[in-house]
A protein has these predicted regions:
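Glycine- and acidic/polar-rich repeat regions and solenoidal domains
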Residues: 140-145, 159-169, 182-433
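Extracellular polysaccharide-degrading/modifying enzymes targeting complex plant/algal/animal polysaccharides
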Residues: 1, 8-147, 152, 159, ...
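Transmembrane beta-barrel wall of Gram-negative outer-membrane proteins
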Residues: 148-154, 173-177
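A short catalytic or substrate-binding loop motif that flags glycine-/basic-rich loops and adjacent residues
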Residues: 32-35, 81-82, 181, 239, ...
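Hydrophobic (often cysteine-bearing) scaffold residues that line and stabilize catalytic clefts
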Residues: 6, 126, 149, 172, ...
Length: 433
């Protein structure tokens, strides 16, 4: 049917008074628990409780996996609901801002920023040190580093930014160290460096930072760290209060170790505290010695996992992590190959390690799209002599039942008070492990 239409719209009677001509928007999880979107309301009939949206959601309305599943959403930018301190309404047509201050403006100042550019941007710089600085109250990113080398952002405070804290792309030997990054619109740190084809390390790091209260504007990307490229490190960070997971990574030979992560996955489902996925060639990454606790596991869908090797991610090592309560699963191995899950401690979880075989249902080897894992591997020249030597099992993937989760090693893990230590999906055979 028409995905722009909702029936039996459950809402307060005050919605009957909303002036949709001013522009009313609804933000929520319209279909899946891992995809939120803001959609404009077009019309609303208070008699039938029928609402029509101005645009279609990418996945439609209603979860096809759960019949009659209730979808969560809320209204934003509603002039008639401006009724408590801290709220505001922007009348774009008349260029007027209505704002109810949360307190005494003489004691607590309010800032309005018009700066859409990064507060500091460096391109091609080297031996640059940013130390003991405060970056705050911008509409965009706080710091952007492009193709820089040997730079350090150290002991800085980044807060109240519209987008992200520190974004570093390209170059090598760049480091974000002992900073506090909080109350930003998207992620705290985005770091991409290194060459996957040549497996040259970026040698960049995110170390010893406090990253919290993130994703105020963009829930889906509101993590502590997004890491990409080859040969970078995320260590000794304290990450908490994120709408989605704590760290996501892609690429090769990254080291994610000795981090403490708690109170993340606050609003998202089917999410990982440490997350990667959908790439056979994303190999050689190590997630070790992290302490993961007090995570939110929202009901419905796939919930949250401490380490999520999603959509046939392969060739990673998960070792020596402590996972204490909160998450639905300690490790979700989603159909991947040649992963090692060893020596982890899982305490008080519904499921310790969960393995499924989604490959036959999802992977394609001859059609375009993100599920063509052979094409993704070919992009990094996975059959080159260098890659054959580094990842010999990957070089043989097409010869060894490529769609099945084979070659994984699960050993020496400890489960305390877990309802189901090992959860194997019905289509997984024990001899594959």
């Amino acid at each position: 049917g028409d995905h722009r239409e909702l029936h039996s719209f459950p809402t307060r009677r005050s919605s009957d008074l909303w002036d949709l001509a001013r522009g009313v928007y609804l933000h929520g999880f319209w279909c899946y628990e891992w995809s939120d979107e803001t959609l404009k309301a077009a019309t609303y009939d208070p008699e039938t409780r029928e609402l029509r949206l101005a645009a279609k959601h990418g996945y439609g309305i209603g979860n096809p996996r759960q019949k009659d599943a209730k979808r969560e959403f809320y209204a934003i930018h509603v002039f008639e609901e401006l009724d408590r301190p801290g709220e505001y309404y922007l009348d774009r047509q008349n260029q007027k801002l209505y704002f109810w201050p949360p307190g005494d403006l003489d004691k607590t100042p309010v800032f309005l920023s018009l700066c859409r550019n990064p507060l500091l941007k460096a391109t091609g710089s080297s031996h640059l040190v940013l130390r003991d600085l405060v970056f705050e109250n911008g509409c965009g990113n706080a710091v952007e580093l492009q193709d820089c080398r040997q730079t350090r952002v150290e002991k800085c405070l980044v807060r109240n930014m519209g987008l992200s804290g520190v974004m570093s792309s390209g170059g090598a030997d760049n480091h974000v160290v002992r900073c506090e990054i909080t109350r930003v619109g998207v992620r705290a740190v985005g770091m991409t460096a290194g060459d996957r084809k040549t497996l040259a390390s970026g040698n960049c790091s995110v170390v010893g930072n406090q990253l919290h209260e993130l994703g105020r504007y963009d829930w889906q990307n509101g993590r502590g760290v997004n890491l990409g490229g080859c040969g970078n490190r995320v260590a000794h960070n304290l990450i908490h209060h994120c709408p989605t997971g704590g760290v996501s990574y892609s690429g090769n030979e990254h080291l994610l170790e000795l981090n403490e992560v708690h109170h993340v996955c606050l609003v998202y489902g089917d999410v990982g505290v440490f997350y990667t996925g959908r790439d056979w060639a994303s190999q050689g990454n190590v997630v070790r010695w992290n302490y993961i606790h007090s995570i939110v596991n929202r009901p419905g869908g796939s919930g949250s996992q401490a380490i999520y090797l999603d959509d046939c991610d392969s060739g990673d090592t998960v070792v020596g992590n402590i996972v204490f309560g909160g998450v639905g699963r300690g490790v979700l191995l989603g159909g991947g190959r040649d992963n090692t899950i060893r020596g982890n401690l899982f305490i008080g979880l519904p499921k310790g390690i969960h393995v499924d075989a989604r490959g036959p249902r999802a992977i394609t080897l001859d059609r375009p799209g993100s599920w063509n894992l052979r094409a993704r591997a070919e992009e990094v020249d996975y059959l080159s002599p260098l890659w054959r030597e580094r990842y010999p099992r990957l070089a043989r993937v097409l010869d060894e039942e490529p769609l099945l989760p084979m070659g994984n090693v699960l050993r020496d893990n400890i489960f305390v008070g877990c309802k189901e230590p090992f959860a194997l999906a019905k289509d997984v055979k024990e001899e594959w492990l």
